[in-house]
């Protein structure tokens, strides 16, 4: 069999998960079912409190054994009264923590100092929110990047730039334009040949 060695850090991580899983299985809704809802430190504090309660319960059991039937009824009433007092104390403590958090809330203190009713205070806050939204929209509109229209390539007005016609070549490219080709065609039609290059210059045809 393979032995699994667990160090202290691994055990500290597993204990909260085990307790959290047990509480979910029992269907308790007093605790959130998240891994962060319980920690090892809180479990140690609970263990300390349990260690203090256990001797009290043991002492109570020893005393109950020597009690009579009439004393048992008094003990039950005393325990019931103590439970009621503890429940009230827990409720007061939770309310005290809630009041403490509210007293540290600046917005709540502003509401109390204003002397307004709840509806008036909420409507005033809504107006402040609407005013802030308007300012944000105005700021966004003012600082939005402007989109320029694309530049047109068609000459407008007194544009003196030369526009090349269809079928016409640029003179710098060394090609003939339409007028040059027309002149060469007319000369060929009249029986004349354009002057040649090399040995063909100045020759005449001789008939025998």
UniProtKB/Swiss-Prot annotation:
Membrane spanning residue stretches: none
PANTHER family: DASH COMPLEX SUBUNIT DUO1
Signal peptide (residue range): none
Protein name: DASH complex subunit DUO1
Family, similarity comment: Belongs to the DASH complex DUO1 family.
Location of the region described as Disordered in the Swiss-Prot/TrEMBL record: 140-208
Gene name tied to this protein: DUO1
Keywords associated with the record: Cell cycle, Cell division, Centromere, Chromosome, Chromosome partition, Coiled coil, Cytoplasm, Cytoskeleton, Kinetochore, Microtubule, Mitosis, Nucleus
UniProt-listed Pfam families: DASH_Duo1
Quaternary structure note: Component of the DASH complex consisting of ASK1, DAD1, DAD2, DAD3, DAD4, DAM1, DUO1, HSK3, SPC19 and SPC34, with a stoichiometry of one copy of each subunit per complex. Multiple DASH complexes oligomerize to form a ring that encircles spindle microtubules and organizes the rod-like NDC80 complexes of the outer kinetochore. DASH complex oligomerization strengthens microtubule attachments. On cytoplasmic microtubules, DASH complexes appear to form patches instead of rings. Within the complex, DAM1 and DUO1 may form the microtubule connections.
GO cellular component: cytoplasm; DASH complex; microtubule; mitotic spindle; spindle pole
GO BP terms: attachment of spindle microtubules to kinetochore; cell division; mitotic sister chromatid biorientation; protein transport along microtubule to mitotic spindle pole body
Localisation: Nucleus; Cytoplasm, Cytoskeleton, Spindle pole; Chromosome, Centromere, Kinetochore
Its biological purpose: Component of the DASH complex that connects microtubules with kinetochores and couples microtubule depolymerisation to chromosome movement; it is involved in retrieving kinetochores to the spindle poles before their re-orientation on the spindle in early mitosis and allows microtubule depolymerization to pull chromosomes apart and resist detachment during anaphase.
Segments of skewed composition (Low complexity): 181-201
Coiled coil: 115-144
């Amino acid at each position: 069999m393979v032995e699994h060695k667990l160090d202290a850090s691994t055990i500290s991580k597993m204990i909260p998960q085990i307790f959290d899983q047990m509480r979910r299985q029992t269907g308790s809704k007093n605790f959130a079912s998240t891994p962060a809802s319980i920690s090892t430190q809180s479990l140690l504090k609970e263990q300390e409190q349990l260690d203090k309660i256990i001797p009290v319960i043991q002492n109570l059991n020893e005393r109950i054994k020597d009690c009579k039937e009439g004393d048992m009824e008094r003990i039950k009433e005393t325990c019931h009264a103590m439970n009621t007092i503890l429940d009230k104390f827990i409720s007061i403590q939770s309310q005290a923590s809630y009041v403490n958090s509210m007293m540290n809330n600046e917005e709540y203190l502003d509401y109390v100092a204003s002397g307004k009713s709840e509806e008036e205070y909420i409507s005033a806050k809504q107006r402040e929110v609407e005013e802030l939204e308007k300012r944000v929209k105005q700021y966004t509109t003012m600082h939005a990047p402007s989109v320029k229209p694309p530049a047109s390539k068609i000459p407008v007005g007194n544009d003196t730039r030369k526009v090349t016609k269809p079928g016409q070549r640029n003179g710098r490219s060394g090609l003939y334009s339409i007028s040059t080709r027309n002149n060469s065609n007319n000369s060929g039609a009249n029986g004349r040949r354009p002057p040649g290059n090399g040995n063909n210059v100045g020759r005449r045809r001789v008939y025998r």
